[in-house]
Regions:
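N-terminal cap/lid segment of alpha/beta-hydrolase-fold proteins
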Residues: 1-24
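The serine-hydrolase catalytic nucleophile loop
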Residues: 37-49, 227-229
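Conserved alpha/beta-hydrolase
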Residues: 49-75
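Alpha/beta-hydrolase active-site loop
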Residues: 80-102
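The alpha/beta-hydrolase serine catalytic core
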Residues: 81-84, 88, 129-244, 249-264, ...
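Short beta-strand immediately N-terminal to the catalytic nucleophile in serine-hydrolase-like folds
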Residues: 107-112, 136
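Gly/Ala-rich beta-loop-alpha elbow adjacent to hydrolase catalytic centers
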Residues: 112-116, 120
Length: 273
């Protein structure tokens, strides 16, 4: 495997990433969308790269502007997931796809983990020539599924209280002011908080417009209501296969090899059709 660190231009901050290439002939390409507060070098972005390149595929993983929780770049200005908006996330995925096409890899398979999977459904609907979609623990999305659950996410039982605080800050021109959350991901700007309540893609609604083959995977330790692979399969307009991985959490800790095998085996079968 050969890895090239790359930079993708946008209308603002460039996106860092890694293009992983096989040593031999390139037989396909895939574009990976990371989840909330993650990045191009952790989780599935990391463990899928050697598996994908071993089967002869180019594999691009990149940071959206909303990567990690908080970060800095070439200044002391704060950036990262605490400030992300859905529109910016959708745009960043489009920038990455366009960059990959400019390298000669048009219409890649799309792979998304968690929030990246939710964004992947939006991307595939907007790019109907996508040959296949892999959803790794994609969330339900939509306006009714933003907090709580057994994983203690986001605002938990303080959604209304924090919504009122965020609205007051935005109205005062302080949309970038940070709020502490009682659950993961712990810190978020007022503007980003309100944006998430309103604009996160509705995965199941978008499934009705997706006709390419889909693999929907999740761990058996995950909340099947929050990560509804079976419901996505039922709603999907095209063929969809579901895999529930045993002894497996949301980040696939200890199950990396098995998850990678499921993904490349499924993609390999598609190549033979």
């Amino acid at each position: 495997m050969r890895t090239e660190l790359i930079s993708i231009p946008t209308d603002g901050v460039p996106l860092d990433g890694a293009l992983h290439l096989p040593d031999g002939q390139i037989k396909g390409s895939a574009l990976y969308f990371h989840g909330n507060t993650m990045n191009f070098y952790t989780g599935a972005a990391r463990f899928l790269a050697p598996a994908m390149t071993a089967m002869g595929w180019a594999f691009l993983a990149f940071n959206r502007r909303g990567h990690d929780i908080l970060t800095t770049r070439a200044s002391r200005a704060a950036e990262g997931g605490a400030f992300q908006t859905v529109a910016e996330s959708v745009a960043d995925n489009r920038y990455a796809a366009n960059w990959l096409a400019q390298q000669g890899y048009s219409n890649p398979v799309i792979i998304g983990h968690s929030y990246g999977g939710m964004l992947a459904t939006r991307h595939v609907v907007d790019h109907p020539n996508t040959p296949a979609l892999v959803l790794l623990s994609a969330g339900r999305g939509g306006q009714e599924n933003v907090s709580g659950g057994r994983e203690n996410l986001f605002a938990m039982d303080r959604t209304q209280e924090l919504t009122d605080q965020a609205k007051a800050l935005v109205a005062a021109g302080q949309g970038d002011a940070l709020l502490s959350l009682p659950g993961w991901w712990w810190v978020i700007s007022a503007r980003s908080f309100l944006d998430r309540l309103q604009h996160v893609p509705d995965t199941l609604a978008l499934a009705q417009q997706i006709r390419c083959p889909v693999l929907a995977l999740r761990g058996d330790q995950e909340d099947r209501t929050r990560y509804p692979a079976e419901e996505f399969q039922a709603a999907c307009a095209g063929p969809c296969e579901v895999r529930v991985m045993p002894m497996c959490d949301h980040f696939y800790n200890g199950c990396e090899e098995q998850v990678a095998k499921e993904v490349v085996t499924w993609l390999g079968r598609l190549q033979q059709l």
